[in-house]
């Protein structure tokens, strides 16, 4: 046991994450969630679990080989013990997914939307299906029987396969068929209903004839999950390569990493499981059976086959992000930011406002440079368009593009090439430190001198996810914040991770210490009987130093409210340890993604928004930025948002001291915070500007120059 830590109020990060994913799964079992959205929650749960095995389980497997006696500082478990616990907790989740999928499928069948088993079809339907199979599927299949002339093939990560146990003259062989990529996954049957069969079911049903010299003893749909845990900075870097070329090689390497999970659909697969376990060196605890399809991505296309009325009743009501309440349509975004600080709240506010800022800056004669950090982008990114346009217009454009953003590497590599071709200067992050911060600095010059527009956000510059994730985007013309941002980009360009800043908290140099300093300040207030309090909203909490400081503050009497969507390694309500800490989690229509850190009470509250969770990887091993909110108006807006989220008793759940979550009591004035913000954004969205407003900005806005910081 590790005697350096107190484990009485902490828990394992992997098991905490599995609890989060269970909350996602249980959204699919809620009657008040529209039927097609319940299907999507099933797919989100499945995709989350896939990535968990690729990243976390893959990493722990490697750890077990290298540091088998290492003990986790939050749970005191060794890697082997963690893997055992993960398997023990994941198996019931498969069973729960099967149960919920079957339930949702029955409800859809009542609406004549049904996944059919071929055995159930009428003779004529089977005949038509076979005709389709022979014409469209059979020509693109590549069946293999493993033998001396056909060695065991590489099975790609997360690609469905048909595995078969074949018998010929008492000799047992193994056959495998990969699902073709370019064939529709759902094949709809003729008729008025929306009955369909899945591609893998068709191949499974008709594939016996592909092995006519054999007797098929067993056959099943299966899927291999491979580790994606590969650190580009740990691999051999050839001096003749640029970093982009190096990353392309890394992506290819990932495809061939060690299998960490085998999934098999159905029940008849005893010999298949035994054979693959030996060939792939996968232990029994890493093999999972499922009654639900192993890949649920097809569910997103189901709504294409239903009527407008069915879509209306079966999906969330379509929502178009509103224009932000603080902006007047038709008036220069730049001029409005020069007048006062602005805050966008996604997905309720539109990201178009920020894109318009880039568009204006790309054309503005006063713009000298645009500097931006990019972690993830949409597949079709207008942000890139305007950065390229700025460079082509003679502006200096510096893009710090993080090529190591997991599973977005190829997209970022492609965009880095486009940006370079347009004349942008592109940097590829920092060695050993991912650049995860969200900072954009626009430097301008007029007759009065240099001035800045700075944007700092909690989420990515991704126009797609900005409609699905809750995030904050802060925009200011503060000279002091702009100067800090300018120092930040200078430090990044010169590989200086230990720079000093007057206002921003920047990891790895000052973020962790800055947060701890503010926790300690609230602790000192409590000890001297002054009003105090801490609110933290984040995706995950794993940083052991932060956890221990929160425990100390709790013991001193500081009321602490933690709103943590995912991993939470602190257990609240432990007497003498965390009894003044309350932890809640909101899981709903939108993915909670904003990070807000508030210290103090009332008008004296100090508020930061950040790209960083309180995870050691963020506070010590990444480049992150937290920005202070000084404007009293914006502070009050964020404090109101915090109060609404605290009142949420529909989507919020409470973490108990034993690590389990429970629902909150219902009231007469029930609160769903996401719906509240959605309706509020619609209600407060600005109308077209009046002639009076337009004249005001024409006269006043043109004279805006350098702007001093509005302090608390």
What are these model-predicted stretches?
Residues 1-534, 552-556, 568-712:
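N-terminal localization/anchoring segments of enzymes in phospholipid and broader phosphate metabolism
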Residues 559-563:
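Hydrophobic alpha/beta core scaffold segments
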Residues 544-547, 551:
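Glycine/threonine-rich ATP-lid/beta-loop region of ATP-binding domains
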């Amino acid at each position: 046991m590790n005697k350096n830590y107190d484990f009485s109020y902490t828990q394992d990060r992997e098991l905490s994450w599995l609890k989060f994913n269970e909350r996602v799964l249980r959204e699919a079992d809620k009657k008040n969630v529209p039927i097609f959205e319940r299907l999507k929650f099933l797919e989100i749960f499945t995709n989350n679990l896939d990535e968990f095995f690729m990243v976390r389980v893959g990493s722990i497997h490697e750890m077990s080989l290298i540091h088998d006696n290492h003990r986790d500082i939050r749970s005191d478990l060794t890697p082997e013990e963690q893997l055992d616990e993960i398997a023990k907790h994941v198996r019931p989740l498969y069973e729960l997914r099967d149960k919920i999928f079957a339930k949702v499928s029955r409800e859809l069948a009542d609406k004549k939307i049904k996944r059919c088993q071929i055995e159930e079809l009428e003779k004529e339907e089977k005949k038509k299906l076979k005709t389709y199979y022979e014409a469209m599927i059979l020509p693109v299949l590549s069946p293999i029987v493993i033998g001396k002339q056909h060695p065991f093939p590489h099975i790609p990560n997360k690609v469905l396969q048909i595995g078969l146990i074949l018998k010929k003259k008492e000799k047992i062989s193994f056959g495998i068929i990969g699902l073709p990529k370019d064939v529709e996954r759902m094949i709809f049957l003729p008729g008025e209903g929306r009955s369909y069969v899945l591609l893998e079911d068709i191949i499974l049903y008709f594939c016996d004839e592909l092995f006519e010299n054999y007797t098929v003893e067993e056959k099943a749909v299966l899927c291999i999950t491979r580790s994606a845990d590969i650190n580009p900075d740990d691999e051999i870097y050839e001096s003749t390569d640029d970093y982009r070329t190096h990353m392309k090689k890394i992506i290819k390497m990932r495809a061939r990493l060690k299998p960490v999970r085998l999934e098999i659909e159905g029940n008849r697969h005893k010999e298949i499981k035994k054979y693959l376990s030996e060939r792939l060196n996968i232990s029994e605890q890493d093999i999972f059976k499922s009654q639900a399809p192993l890949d649920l991505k097809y569910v997103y296309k189901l709504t294409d086959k239903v009527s407008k009325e069915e879509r209306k009743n079966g999906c969330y009501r379509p929502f178009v992000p509103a224009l932000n309440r603080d902006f007047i349509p038709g008036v220069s975004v730049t001029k409005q930011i020069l007048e006062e600080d602005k805050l966008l709240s996604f997905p309720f506010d539109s990201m178009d406002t920020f894109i318009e800022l880039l568009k204006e800056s790309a054309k503005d004669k006063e713009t000298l440079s645009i500097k931006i950090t990019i972690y993830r982008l949409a597949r079709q990114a207008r942000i890139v368009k305007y950065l390229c346009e700025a460079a082509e217009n003679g502006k200096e454009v510096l893009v710090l593009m993080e090529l190591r953003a997991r599973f977005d590497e190829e997209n970022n590599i492609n965009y880095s090439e486009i940006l370079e071709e347009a004349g942008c200067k592109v940097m590829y992050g920092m060695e050993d430190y991912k650049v995860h911060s969200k900072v954009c600095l626009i430097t301008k010059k007029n007759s009065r001198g240099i001035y800045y527009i700075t944007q700092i956000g909690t989420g990515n510059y991704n126009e797609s996810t900005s409609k699905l994730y809750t995030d904050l985007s802060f925009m200011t013309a503060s000279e002091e914040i702009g100067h800090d941002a300018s120092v930040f980009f200078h430090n990044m360009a010169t590989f200086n991770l230990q720079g000093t800043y007057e206002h921003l908290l920047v990891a790895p140099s000052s973020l962790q210490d800055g947060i701890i300093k503010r926790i300690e300040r609230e602790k000192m207030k409590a000890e001297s009987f002054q009003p105090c309090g801490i609110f933290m909203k984040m995706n995950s909490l794993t940083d052991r130093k932060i956890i221990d400081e929160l425990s100390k503050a709790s013991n001193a009497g500081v009321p602490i409210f933690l709103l943590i969507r995912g991993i939470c390694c602190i257990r609240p309500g432990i007497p003498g340890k965390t009894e003044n800490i309350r932890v809640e989690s909101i899981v709903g229509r939108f993915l909670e993604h904003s990070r807000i850190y508030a210290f103090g009470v009332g008008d004296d509250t100090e508020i930061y928004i950040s790209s960083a969770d309180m995870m050691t990887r963020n506070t010590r091993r990444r480049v992150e930025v937290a920005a202070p909110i000084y404007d009293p108006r914006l502070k009050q807006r964020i404090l109101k948002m915090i109060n609404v989220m605290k009142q949420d008793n529909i989507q919020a759940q409470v973490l108990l001291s034993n690590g389990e979550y429970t629902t909150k009591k219902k009231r007469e004035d029930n609160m769903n915070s996401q719906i509240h913000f959605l309706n509020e954004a619609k209600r407060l969205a600005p109308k077209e500007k009046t002639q009076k407003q337009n004249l005001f900005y024409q006269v006043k806005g043109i004279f805006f120059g350098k702007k001093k910081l509005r302090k608390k």
